[in-house]
Amino acid sequence: MTVSPVALRRKTECKPHPTARYWKKCDVEALFGLPFLELVHQAAEVHRQNFNPREIQLSTLLSIKTGGCPEDCAYCPQSAHHNTNLGKEQMMDVDEIVEKAKIAKSRGASRFCMGAAWRGPKPKDVETVSAIIKAVKGLGMETCGTFGMLEEGMAEDLKEAGLDYYNHNLDTDPDRYNDIIHTRRHEDRMDTLGKVRNAGLKVCCGGIVGMNETRAERAGLIASLANLDPQPESVPINRLVKVEGTPLADAEDLDWTEFVRTIAVARITMPQSYVRLSAGRSNMPEAMQAMCFMAGANSIFYGDKLLTTGNPDEDGDRILMEKLNLYPLQFELEGEVAEVEKASGIKVDY
């Protein structure tokens, strides 16, 4: 199917949140095929229609229970199936987690994300993380949890504890899901996402690119995300971090322009979602990150570690945001410039 750039522009300009819009995989692939600068320009226009392009949401991610996961995800160093020299650790102490959240807030983060290497939590685990969520919410931060597949009633318990977002990624194109993961199905992910929505939680749902997939398969991932109804409030786009001992340790590098295209297509197809630069950012040059922000990314993980892999240091992020005249989402410019600069270390110039 051939779709002209003019027709695509007509579809994306000044459109409301397309809850009734079904994205065919071929239509998404046609977006990927637009001339690079034309695609970035269209995505930037959509972004400006829905967000302040200078605001960046700063989130911090903490692994509260690391390693020993029974799932066999080909990309993950925490899987017990892979020899990555990552030991299994017990759940962190509640006070230690809260202290990490306090530090994150003092450095400008507005959202605190917690991950646990479980296939799914047990009822006693839900009790434990509920206490953690309440404590972090007491600091005035948004909370997000990624704890695996949920049983009936668990999402409601997490919601009652004060959880704002539940992260549950679709990982890759549904058509190649079982090439990457054998211990669960795409349908299992959809089942938990349904439980999360029914409980009234916001959804954080994205995927990983750079796992030897084709462009058509990247389009399939974006289409599967964009066709969630309602669309995810938050969409993390991860660039594979290759870890020795995992099946994807020798994956072919994804060209930087293809990653930027993925960000742009995510922005066009999900205009009101936060699109987050997630894993893999430590290997992205500043110019590449700037292109991603131009293409519609408006959220980053802030801190030197993502679960078990590296992330740009906070000083580097502050410097980059100053260069690009970006500022943290949690503050309004008018009347609160001093607070922005004090908490994040980022000088706001407007």
UniProtKB/Swiss-Prot annotation:
It comes from the Bacteria. It catalyses: (4R,5S)-dethiobiotin + (sulfur carrier)-SH + 2 reduced [2Fe-2S]-[ferredoxin] + 2 S-adenosyl-L-methionine = (sulfur carrier)-H + biotin + 2 5'-deoxyadenosine + 2 L-methionine + 2 oxidized [2Fe-2S]-[ferredoxin]. GO terms for biological process: biotin biosynthetic process. [4Fe-4S] cluster binds at residues 69, 73, 76. InterPro entries: Aldolase_TIM, BATS_dom, Biotin_synth/BioAB, Biotin_synthase, Elp3/MiaA/NifB-like_rSAM, rSAM. Keywords: 2Fe-2S, 4Fe-4S, Biotin biosynthesis, Iron, Iron-sulfur, Metal-binding, S-adenosyl-L-methionine, Transferase. It is an enzyme of class 2 (transferase). GO terms for molecular function: 2 iron, 2 sulfur cluster binding; 4 iron, 4 sulfur cluster binding; biotin synthase activity; iron ion binding. Its cofactor is [4Fe-4S] cluster; [2Fe-2S] cluster. PROSITE patterns: RADICAL_SAM. [2Fe-2S] cluster binds at residues 113, 144, 204, 276. Binds 1 [4Fe-4S] cluster. The cluster is coordinated with 3 cysteines and an exchangeable S-adenosyl-L-methionine. Binds 1 [2Fe-2S] cluster. The cluster is coordinated with 3 cysteines and 1 arginine. The keyword Iron-sulfur applies. Residues 54-278 form the Radical SAM core domain. Pathway: Cofactor biosynthesis; biotin biosynthesis; biotin from 7,8-diaminononanoate: step 2/2. Its EC number is 2.8.1.6. Disulfide bonds: none annotated. Belongs to the radical SAM superfamily. Biotin synthase family. Catalyzes the conversion of dethiobiotin (DTB) to biotin by the insertion of a sulfur atom into dethiobiotin via a radical-based mechanism. This is Biotin synthase. It comes from Neisseria meningitidis serogroup C / serotype 2a (strain ATCC 700532 / DSM 15464 / FAM18). The lineage of its organism: Bacteria, Pseudomonadati, Pseudomonadota, Betaproteobacteria, Neisseriales. The gene is bioB.
